[in-house]
Swiss-Prot record:
Chain's gene name: umv3
Region Disordered: start-end pairs: 1-197
Name of the protein described by the UniProt record: Sexual development regulator umv3
Residue stretches of biased makeup (Basic and acidic residues): 171-181
GO biological process, one term: sporulation resulting in formation of a cellular spore
Length: 412
């Protein structure tokens, strides 16, 4: 018996299903690649037309799925497959070739010779044969098309790498921020461009438009305030040498009006400054007699007749002692910052003194009166003036109680 007869006899002794399956596999995907240590059999290599038939007829390109083997053949291949040889696994042996991926490539790459694409890739090199170093090199290398331009993915990768801050740039940012924090601050501006008030050959007049008439004694605490009634309102007029009124100077920001309290001296009949009053607290035996904001700034508004005027309003003045008092007002001109030292203060332009008014105890206070038309006019223009529309007098309240009592007695 010859060697060829032995080969035929050995092939005929194999199970029929295995032989038919091998023939089907050879017809579809070609012969099995040689294992390690086996000699390559050139007689089993199919012709060129077999690859063409594999590319065009058998493989389902849209699905890209390997053909399903019968369970008996799959078990046989798993037993014959040695462990650790990933290149001979059933999944990798049925992967479509590189020719099928060229069909999904862009149009400018489909015209390229397939044989040239296959020649660039070594025979038998599968996806599992890539080492981590080769994969990293493949990802880092910029991909280019036929015209030599980089792909969009490689451009995004390069932009991401270039946008990452380097240690040197971070250090420069820290130095710059440190310089900004430790840089000397700019000197305060010398406000020389502000409109300065000039007193050359001008006449200043303070007109008391609203005289306080009465008030209620307030407590020693800072929250117990009883404002004067009515509120003190003064008007400023500045007259030029030619007799015209200087409205721009009246609205100057360096003009302020200061108020102080004066009390009648029963011995001399005059008035002296009333500054302090004795308290019951040993820690603070003295306190200020006049409570509230004692300095007011100018407010340019419309008068009752519609003309422009400059007003000073004191809204929260209260007094901590009973008696007869007067309010003394002084108009001060403050110099702009940087012109004179702060300790120099300002100089007095004109003064005004109110009529005497009375501060009552809580039992004797007759009650608050209704706000004047001037106070309502200023409040409508945005100036903070408290307005009272009702008359709350203690005497009227007592009269109403007496009248109601008489009516009840008459009904009886």
């Amino acid at each position: 018996m010859s060697a060829q007869d032995d080969i035929d006899t050995g092939a005929s002794n194999q199970p029929r299903s295995v032989v038919e399956t091998d023939q089907q596999r050879a017809a579809v995907v070609g012969p099995r690649p040689p294992r390690h240590g086996e000699a390559e059999c050139t007689d089993a290599i199919p012709a060129r037309d077999s690859y063409q038939r594999y590319d065009t007829e058998v493989v389902d390109v849209p699905s890209m799925r390997p053909p399903v083997l019968p369970p008996s053949r799959a078990n046989t291949l798993s037993k014959q497959q040695p462990r650790g040889d990933l290149s001979q696994s059933s999944a990798s042996s049925h992967l479509p070739g590189l020719r099928q991926f060229t069909r999904l490539a862009p149009a400018n790459m489909q015209g390229k010779d397939r044989s040239g694409l296959l020649s660039d890739r070594p025979s038998g090199l599968l996806l599992s044969d890539h080492t981590p170093n080769s994969q990293h090199a493949h990802r880092s290398a910029p991909q280019r098309d036929d015209n030599g331009r980089q792909s969009a993915a490689s451009n995004r990768l390069s932009d991401t790498n270039s946008s990452a801050p380097s240690p040197g740039s971070t250090e420069n940012e820290r130095v710059r921020m440190h310089d900004q924090r430790t840089a000397p601050s700019a000197p305060p501006p010398l406000l020389s461009d502000l409109p300065r008030h000039s007193t050359d050959n001008k006449t200043y007049r303070l007109i008391i438009r609203q005289q306080p008439k009465q008030g209620r004694l307030c407590g020693l605490g800072s929250k117990d305030k009883r404002p004067l009634d009515p509120l003190p309102i003064l008007q400023l007029r500045i007259i030029r040498p030619d007799g015209t009124e200087d409205e721009d100077a009246e609205n100057s920001s360096n003009l302020v009006l200061q108020v102080s309290l004066c009390k009648e001296d029963p011995i001399t009949g005059g008035y002296t400054d009333a500054v302090l009053v004795e308290t019951n607290d040993p820690s603070y035996p003295w306190t200020r007699m006049l409570e509230g904001r004692i300095v007011a700034s100018a407010n340019l508004a419309r008068d009752l007749d519609g003309s422009r005027a400059c007003f000073f309003v004191f809204t929260d003045l209260s007094i901590r002692q009973e008696g007869q008092f007067r309010l003394a007002f002084k108009l001060l001109a403050l110099s702009p910052p940087g012109q004179v030292p702060a300790s120099a203060g300002g100089h007095v332009l004109t003064e005004a003194l109110t009529e005497p008014f009375t501060i009552y105890s809580p039992r004797r206070f007759p009650g608050m009166t209704e706000s004047t038309d001037l106070a309502k006019c200023l409040a409508r223009q945005g100036i903070q003036v408290p307005v009272r529309n009702d008359i709350r007098k203690k005497q009227e309240h007592l009269d109403s109680l007496t009248a109601s009592t008489d009516d009840m007695n008459g009904l009886e």
